Structures are given as structure tokens and as C-alpha cells.
Amino acid sequence: MLILELIKGIILGIVEGLTEFAPVSSTGHMILVDDMWLKSSEFLGSQSAFTFKIVIQLGSVFAGAWVFRERYFEMLHIGKYRHEPIDGIGQKPKRLNLLHIIVGMIPAGVLGLLFDDVIQEYLFSVPTVMIGLFIGAIYMIIADIYSKKVTNPRNVDQINYFQAFVIGLSQAIAMWPGFSRSGSTISTGVLMKMNHKSASDFTFIMAVPVMLAASGLSLVKNMEYIHMSDIGFYVLGFLAAFIVGLIAIKTFLYLISKIKLIPFAIYRIVLVIIIAILYFGFGIGQGITGE
């Protein structure tokens, strides 16, 4: 594999790491950077390029798992948390616990099992991604405006099971390509009277198991498309996504309490305009599908 192609793999890993957990839609950015510019499918083949995107997404997922490892250890009662007082479901009282995460995962898990192939076949196109980007941006703006009326927002350890389920429903809705899982769930958390940082924490903590299961299953189904001659491309992309993902998640969690969601929403609208100009004005990206 040529050096230029390896550099492209690193670039795509960086883009994935920057955007997977930010409320800006990693799908929209992959369309812009890969499908419209770098075009990994031209030197990997369409199925191998699709598999590569699964691999770099896993890099971002592992970054999220690392950032929130202490929370997972606490919920699973592992390590230094194994001797702490627990309640009836194996967790400390009045804390975010494993049942919150399970309840939040149910909607996306069920819909993913039932409709993932349908979504990939019928909803994954440039116009539908642009629709998801735009509607998601409006939802984020609405959430930010509403948050100004909340006088005593909840933190992540005050969330109840009903709120966890509702946020999980919004994660399921975000299966529409371009809508953005984090944009949808953070906005819903804010509408459920959580502060922005806590809504982001819960979003990421809940998203990692869902994404790990979904990406892991997809990778198993597509392992045959990973060729040893391309292994360097996959490894560099994965590492880039993991390292950049670590930095991006920590930076986002610092920024979200200060700038809220509207700046990200405006960015999404600008992204829609750029993609629309390239797609409708210049015909770039015509025929893009999920696989």
C-alpha cells in the first residue's frame, strides 16, 4: 500500500476521532471527507472501505471506554469499588448505575437489531444525511433555548429510570443517518432538565456499550473484507481514531458547559450547506449508499 493511501487512513481516523462523540454527525463528515474527497473505496473497494469505517469507529469507542473507565468500574463493582456499599441491583445508592444504562440501551438495541439493514439500504444517502444534520441542529437549538429556563438542572447521578429510557429513545431516533447520536441524546437530556455536562456524560457512558456491540457485530460480519495487504491502513486509522478520540472527548466535555449546543448546531447547518453545494451544484457524491 502506498504512503499516500496510509496518510488517507490516518486522516480518516482523525476525522472519526474528532466527530464520533461530538454532536456534529460523524456520518456527515465521513461523506464530506471520504466519499466526496479521499474516496477510500477507490483503492480498497466498497466493502473494504465500509469495513475500514467500522474499524476506526471502534477506535473512537475504545477511546470513550477509556475516558469513562472509572464510571464503568464503579457500576460493575470492579477494582477499588468492589468493597463499597451497594443497593439491591449491585450499585451504590443514589448513583448512576448499571440499570440506568441498560434501560437507556433498550430502544436503540431493539430497533438496531430489527432495522439496521433497512436503514443502511434505504436511509443512507447524501440527501437523507443532510436532512438528519439539519433537523438535529434545530433540535439542539430548541434544547439550548429551553435550558435557559431551567433553574436547578440535575446532575448525572440524579437521573431516574424514566429519564434514562427517554434519552435512550432519542438514541434510537438518531439511527437516522446524520442526526447524530450525541446531538440527539444530549439535547434530550437537557430537555429532561439535566445540565449540559451531565447530559453529555450520560450520553457517552450509555453510547459506548451500544456502539461496541453494533460495531463489533458489523466487524464480525465483514471480517472477510480485511486483507493482510491493507492491514497497515486499518491499524493506522484505528490508532488515529483512538488517540484523537481521547483528546476530542475530554475537550468536548470541557467546552460543553461553557458554549452549550448552539455553536455546534450552527456548524452543522454550515456543513449541510457545504455538502448541498457539492452534491447538487457539482454532482459530487452522487450514488453514495451505506455499503
Swiss-Prot record:
- So where does this one cross the membrane? 1-21, 48-68, 99-119, 123-143, 159-179, 200-220, 236-256, 269-289
Q: What Enzyme Commission number(s) apply to this enzyme?
A: 3.6.1.27
* Reactions catalysed according to its record: di-trans,octa-cis-undecaprenyl diphosphate + H2O = di-trans,octa-cis-undecaprenyl phosphate + phosphate + H(+)
Give the record's GO CC terms. plasma membrane
Superkingdom is Bacteria
Which InterPro entries does the UniProt record give? Answer: UppP
Q: How does it sit in the membrane?
A: Multi-pass membrane protein
Tell me the keywords, alphabetical order.
Antibiotic resistance, Cell membrane, Cell shape, Cell wall biogenesis/degradation, Hydrolase, Membrane, Peptidoglycan synthesis, Transmembrane, Transmembrane helix
Write out the annotated subcellular location. Cell membrane
GO biological process terms, alphabetically, are: cell wall organization; peptidoglycan biosynthetic process; regulation of cell shape; response to antibiotic
Keyword Hydrolase belongs to the record:
yes
Q: Name one GO molecular function term.
A: undecaprenyl-diphosphatase activity
Class of the enzyme per the UniProt entry, highest EC level = hydrolase
Matching PANTHER family, A to Z? UNDECAPRENYL-DIPHOSPHATASE (PTHR30622:SF3)
The UniProt entry, under NCBIfam families, shows:
PRK00281.1-4, undec_PP_bacA
State the remark under miscellaneous: Bacitracin is thought to be involved in the inhibition of peptidoglycan synthesis by sequestering undecaprenyl diphosphate, thereby reducing the pool of lipid carrier available.
Return the similarity comment: Belongs to the UppP family.
**According to its UniProt entry, what is the function of this protein?**
Catalyzes the dephosphorylation of undecaprenyl diphosphate (UPP). Confers resistance to bacitracin.
| Protein's name according to its UniProt entry | Undecaprenyl-diphosphatase
Q: Which organism is it from?
A: Staphylococcus saprophyticus subsp. saprophyticus (strain ATCC 15305 / DSM 20229 / NCIMB 8711 / NCTC 7292 / S-41)
What gene does the UniProt entry assign to this protein? Answer: uppP
